[in-house]
Amino acid sequence: MAQEIRAIVRIGDTDLDGNKTVAYALAKIRGIGIATAYAICRKLGIDPHATLGLLPEDQINKLDWAVRNLHELAPAWFLNRRKDPETGRDLHLIGSELVLAAKRDVDLMKKLKSWKGIRHSLGLKVRGQRTVTTGRFGATAGVTKKKAAPGGK
């Protein structure tokens, strides 16, 4: 009997394509890149080149647990939110948690009126890029060409 392939697998509150390999399917989760996906597979002993939809339910549950609790499996330097300002713990955020944490960080900078916060609130570049010629907004000032004189050379 041929094994059924699941078209959609839910891991980390994200619907993943069951036809892709495990590593590349995991990389579709926001906050999990390809290197992190391979590290998770290596840590759990799952073949990263296996098709995700063919994995048994217990391995999918292991993957879901590992994605949600990566801070327990990986060293601190591998995580995407070290020394969280609110809790002081090393975390690895995924999905909407990652987006909301970044938004909260920017809002905090704006509230504290730090240099970066002021630049964010003004809609200017934040990381030291040049702004003389690039990053302009508003209508472009076009150059109009003079009308040619009639009968001229």
UniProtKB/Swiss-Prot annotation:
One of its GO terms (molecular function) is structural constituent of ribosome. The keyword Cell inner membrane does not apply. This is Small ribosomal subunit protein uS13. NCBIfam families: PRK04053.1, uS13_arch. PROSITE patterns: RIBOSOMAL_S13_1 (PS00646), RIBOSOMAL_S13_2 (PS50159). Belongs to the universal ribosomal protein uS13 family. Located at the top of the head of the 30S subunit, it contacts several helices of the 16S rRNA. In the 70S ribosome it contacts the 23S rRNA (bridge B1a) and protein L5 of the 50S subunit (bridge B1b), connecting the 2 subunits; these bridges are implicated in subunit movement. Keywords: Ribonucleoprotein, Ribosomal protein, RNA-binding, rRNA-binding. Part of the 30S ribosomal subunit. Forms a loose heterodimer with protein S19. Forms two bridges to the 50S subunit in the 70S ribosome. It holds the Pfam family Ribosomal_S13. GO terms for biological process: translation. GO terms for cellular component: cytosol; small ribosomal subunit.
